[in-house]
A protein has these predicted regions:
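Basic, Lys/Arg-enriched alpha-helical interface segments
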Residues: 1-64, 69-84
Length: 84
């Protein structure tokens, strides 16, 4: 069962600014998030709270998706997209 993904407007702006070579990797990472959000990434604070709802998922070698898993709503909110 897939979870819908909601992308924050700031993350949408970051996506619009990504280089073309990052877009396929991002699409693949978002597909993984849709199918397995809790197991896809790693907690933003793995030492103190490994099961945290706010997680990071790397993509494309230098990209990072920061997202929130809303288990109750069966939804994923993408908060930030970064590319270095």
């Amino acid at each position: 069962v897939s979870c819908p993904i909601d992308i924050d407007p700031r993350a949408q702006d970051a996506i619009a600014a990504l280089p073309a070579e990052a877009l396929l990797a991002l699409a693949e990472a978002l597909a993984v998030l849709e199918l397995a959000p809790g197991g896809a990434g790693r907690s933003v604070n793995p030492d103190l709270n490994p099961d945290a709802a706010v997680r990071n998922l790397p993509f494309g070698g230098t990209g990072m998706i920061t997202y929130l898993v809303l288990e109750r709503d069966r939804r994923v909110d993408v908060l930030l997209i970064t590319w270095a």
